[in-house]
Amino acid sequence: MSSNLEFKIQNFKSGEYQCLADLNIYDSPSCERLATQAATGRHLWVTSNYQDVETRGGEPARMTAFPTHQATGGASVQVCLCEDDYPGWLSLSDFSLLQPCTVPYKAKTFSESEIKKRLPEVIAFTQKAMQQSNYYLWGGTVGPNYDCSGLMQAAFASVGIRIPRDAYQQEAFSQPIAITELQPGDLVFFGFQKATHVGLYLANGCYIHSSGKDKGRNGIAIDSLSEQEDEISQSYYQQLRGAGRVVKSYEPQRR
């Protein structure tokens, strides 16, 4: 580890920070696979639930006040995103892109009618994203490349509404509705044992989503809830499990 990075670690305190740039958040301390992303301006907590002692030659060398992990080629710290309570690992090399929060994150509240008024903008966000060159990115929540639930989260966040991160979490968070009750801006969920994919309903049986390379369109596209369309639409339709309506904005459980 460089002396500059060591200095950052030694002087970095646990607490709430704001992102000065778009940041990658990983699913393990090794920072090899993307879990999610934190857009510029988002808040995160550097967690502090235990102390980590590094040793050199069998003797304690330094004690850090928050969970860190030494991985091949770098180091990481455990974090939790404030807006959706999503946990992950941040590379210590990105510490310079954080600033301490002077004002803690406070979730906004919206009535169901206020959310309904914003749905045309939510839909417009996804359609604009589709017009840009993009591909499916596992863990992607920052344009131009998204995963399915990341696109949904970003679209609602664009109008100030927060929803959970993953498809199964979004399903549990939304108000269940029948497929026959679908309206523009509702969420449609796919998967067998649990929701593993999500899209945004448009109209006339069509929905917009970001799907993968192997079994999808490798990016954002519009498909139909029908067995009469192409193979990809049919494949997802066979996994259709339900629909949900966003009637509130997520409020973090962490205090």
Model-derived regions: residue spans:
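Short, basic/aromatic beta-hairpin or loop at an interaction surface
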Residues: Q10-I25, A154-Q169, A203
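Aromatic- and glycine-rich peptidoglycan recognition patches
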Residues: G15-N24, A35, L202-R255
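Short, conserved secondary-structure segments in the cores of folded domains
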Residues: R33-L34, A178
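SH3/SH3-like beta-barrel superfamily modules
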Residues: L34-F95
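Surface-exposed beta-loop interaction hotspot
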Residues: L97-Y135, T141
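Catalytic cysteine-centered active-site loop
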Residues: N134-P184
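...with weaker cross-activation on analogous glycine-rich loops/strands in unrelated enzymes
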Residues: R162-Q228
